[in-house]
Amino acid sequence: MRVIISAGGTGGHIYPALAIINKIKEEEPDSEILYIGTTDRMEKDLIPSLGYKYEALEVKGLKRKLTLDNIKTVTCFVSAIKRAKEIIKDFDPDIVIGCGGYVTAPVIYAAKKLGKRTFIHEQNSVVGLANKFLSRYTDKVGVSFESTIKDFPKDKAILTGNPCSEKALSIKATTKDKLGVDKDKKLVLIVMGSLGSRSVNDRIFSFVDKFRNKNYSVIIVTGNSYYERVKERRVPDNVKVVPFIYEMPSVMKITDLMVTRAGASTMSEITALGVPAIFIPSPYVANNHQ
């Protein structure tokens, strides 16, 4: 089977896409996968590093309010459709799958116009702009929440859950030795989504010394964008600061408490693994859905 899968921007879209890829490869090991992402977001480095073919489209996000920027976005979208058609014709997939993010819009639209089978997946409890638009051009829509079925055509919506749940259960737990923390202490994991949060990072580092001499270890995942600002910061011996963790479920499996955003994929993993958690919902998401 030949599959094109597209997702971009944040781990909340990328990791469900990877979970689907893993399932496809598990069922049909000889399947060929082509991933289409953006030119400037985290997937452009992550996906090739995992050994998958990667093509990039230049896309911009559509503002929910009417602005001049949206004119540029539409122009960019038209160019991206043209390029997506070229990629799809060349690869000739059996199916094209979109897991969210602006990059999926030109890919799924182009695929439908070329007569390819299409499927999109909506992870969130509030449907994103891209998937609302794409629902008229796709064959089926997978949703994580029963409440979002009503937002899509009745003959297309399927309650699938979040693909990350199953993947989280299948990933092998890491060890505290590998993480470089005390194996005899409980572990607190602080991570504000795949991109991190400047405001939360700043707040945590304002009291990081209070962790000193506590009977637990702390791992702070800053996000790649913020790591340079704090990597030289002196922290207590029981605190470890890292920019990013790829196989987050492997760490979550040995975590005693997680402090995190309330993203759909993260919550699916936490629920599947039964990790105690404190949520700090992001205020910068569509319709405050976290």
What function would you assign to each model-found segment?
Residues 13-25:
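Short amphipathic alpha-helix
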Residues 93-95, 239, 245, 253-266, ...:
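Acidic donor-binding loop of glycosyltransferase active sites
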Residues 3-8, 27-76, 81, 160:
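Conserved nucleotide-sugar phosphate-binding/catalytic loop shared by glycosyltransferases and other
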Residues 42, 53, 112-173:
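Active-site-proximal region of nucleotide-activated glycan assembly enzymes
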Residues 52, 116-117, 256-257, 274-282:
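Structural loop-to-beta junction motif characteristic of Rossmann-like glycosyltransferase folds
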Residues 41, 46, 50, 173-175, ...:
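Donor-nucleotide binding loops and adjacent catalytic segments primarily
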Residues 109, 249, 267-273:
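Short alpha-helical segment that forms part of, or immediately flanks, the ligand-binding pocket
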Residues 83-96, 103-119, 132-140:
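Glycosyltransferases and closely related glycan-assembly transferases
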